[in-house]
Amino acid sequence: MKKTKGSIMLLFAAFFWGTTFVAQTTASDQIGTFTFNGSRSIVGAAFLALLILARTGMKKQKAKVSGEPVEKESIKRTVIGGILCGCVLFFATNLQQSGIAAYPEGVASSGRSGFLTATYVVMVAIVSGLLGKKLHKIVYVAVFVCLGGMYMLCMSGGIDNLYFGDLLGLLCAVCFTGHILTVDHFNDCDSVKISCIQFITNGVLSLICMAIFEQPAWSDLAAAWFPILYAGIFSSGIAYTLQIAGQKYADPA
C-alpha cells in the first residue's frame, strides 16, 4: 500500500515536470538560465515556506485542543540534507535549462531535453546495482530500450543530428541521478522542509551566478512572469516535494 502511495506521488511529480518543459522552453527565449532557475527556485521556496507556516499553525492548534505537546524534531539533519540536495539540484537544473537554450531554432528542444533528462531513471538503477543492490530483470531491458531511444533521437540522422544541448541534457541526467540518491539518503527528514531548504540553496546559488553572468533587465523578468510562476509553484514547489515524499515509500531504483 505504501509503495503504491509513493508511486502515485512520483507519477504526479513526473506529470508536473513534463508540463514544465514547455514553460522552460518559453523562458529560454526571454531570460537567461541562471535568472530563470534563480527566480523559479525562490518562488518555489516561498510557496513551501507558506505551506510550512500553515501546517505548523494547524499542528499547534491541534495540540492546543488535544492538550498534547507539539512534537519537536531535529532540524540539523534536515538543513544539511536540504543544502546538499540544493547544491546538486543547482547543477542539474541549470545544465537542463542551458541544454534547452542551446538547441538551434526549429529543433524540438522540449522533447529531446525531456527524454534525455528522463534517462536518470536508468542511471539510478545502474548506480544502485553497482552499489550492490539486486536489480529486477526488467531494469536490464529498460537500459537497452533507453539506449535505443537515445540513438534514434540523437543519432538517427548521423552525427549532424547530435547537438551540444544533447550533451548538456545527459550531464543534467547524471546530476539528477545524484539528486535522487541524495534525497534517498535523507528520506527520514521532513519532505516539505527539506524541499524548501533545497530551493533556497538552489535559488541563492543561481541568483549569484545571475548577478555575475547575466544581469537581466526587469522588463525581461516581467515578460517571463508566467513560466517563472508556473515552474516555481508546480515544478519546484509541488513536484519536487512529491518526489521527496514519494521516495520515502518507493525504491529510488
Describe these PLM feature segments.
Residues M1-S39, C87, F91, L95, ...:
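Glycine-/small-residue-enriched transmembrane alpha-helix faces in small-molecule transporters
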Residues T35-A46, T93-K133, C172, P252-A253:
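Specific alpha-helical transmembrane segments that line the substrate/conduction pathway
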Residues T20, T56-L116, M150-M152, G232-A250:
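Specific transmembrane alpha-helical segments of multi-pass solute transporters/efflux pumps
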